[in-house]
Amino acid sequence: MSSHAARPQRWDLFCRVIDNLGDAAVCWRLARQLAQDPGQSVRLWIDQPDVLARLVPGVRAGRSQQGVRIEAWRPDALALIRPSRNDVADRVIAGFGCELPPAYRAAMRQRRPVWINLEYFSAEGWTRGSHGLPSPKSDGLTEYFFFPGLGAETGGVLCEPNLLAERAAFEQDPWARSGFLDRLGLSPKPGQRIASLFAYPNAPWPGLLEALARTGLPWTVLVPQGVLTEINSSAWPAGLAVQRIPFLSQDDYDRLLWCCDLNLVRGEDSLIRALWAGRPMIWQAYPQAEQAHLPKVAAWLDHLLGALEPPPGKGAAPRQGSVACNSDMPGSGPGLSPAHSSPASPDAAIRQAWLAWNADPNAPPVASAIHDALAASVRWQALSAALCRNEARLPSLAQRLLAFIDSRL
């Protein structure tokens, strides 16, 4: 993002924590990436700084961390209840459409900053038509909708400049992997498969564990403390183990995803981090009434299952610091597959596993669906690596945001 170095700006990013960890995680990642651009001054206003502190050790309200000033969004915050024109930043981002503090919003009329409504991520096609649209206000200000998504016609996804290079170095260093797993209390034997499980309380986890047990392969399922507390770690068939792990920082969660043969994730932030892991995963969308979440799942699947087709930007250079997503990772390939072949096509098996995990009433039972998808692990791995590779060719969300703002000036 160095092309913007000659344009120092002040940024205020507002975040109300609704989905617990995910909202804080996304806003922090964006704030940190903006702050890495020389000359940028970034404040992150967050109503629950303690949630962010769980993800980023050392974060405290009233202090700067990695170039970002963390401010507690409280009713008594002076800069929010009596802001002057100079208190308003040049660039104002409302995380996930949150309502800005009334007095700050009123002061924006004098400063007239660029105002961005950062929406939730979606892979659905309709976001391409809504991304970047203006919303003029009665006081003369304009709010712009910014939709993160997949492909070149959206706001993109968050990715640190050197993330994929760091992942490659980690995967190529067996001591780094074993040392990390050892810190979690895990010493996998040769041939041991590892799955991470981060899910909402309604996740059909018994079907997942049954599917893993039916493969006949040794699996260890890593579940964070406080997630799916009803899982009993001691009563499973031979070859299957469930192990609790401590809550991890953002950086360590990335390493966990890089270590696993299968990642089950939930929400927006962990979905994108699993994308950059380039490994087979199943995403649990936030459950909604009348299965309103299923189109979101289907939209991601369309991108995943079409990832090996030539992308629109074929031939574009990867972003700085990126590397190709490896399709031949430790633990992937034929050795991950169960002994039998799925009767369904590989792509159909992968789709059905995702839909079953997300409670699609028309999907097969969870255990059968995931079992069949694991039988298609070679294809699953290739698709996962290809989708990672396709998105890595494109500018990141932070890069697109800076370019979008420049185009409006």
Predicted regions and their residues:
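Intrinsically disordered, low-complexity terminal tails and inter-domain linkers enriched
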Residues: 5, 309-346
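Active-site and donor-binding regions of nucleotide-sugar-utilizing enzymes
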Residues: 13-141
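A donor-sugar binding/catalytic signature common to diverse glycosyltransferases
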Residues: 28-31, 248-296
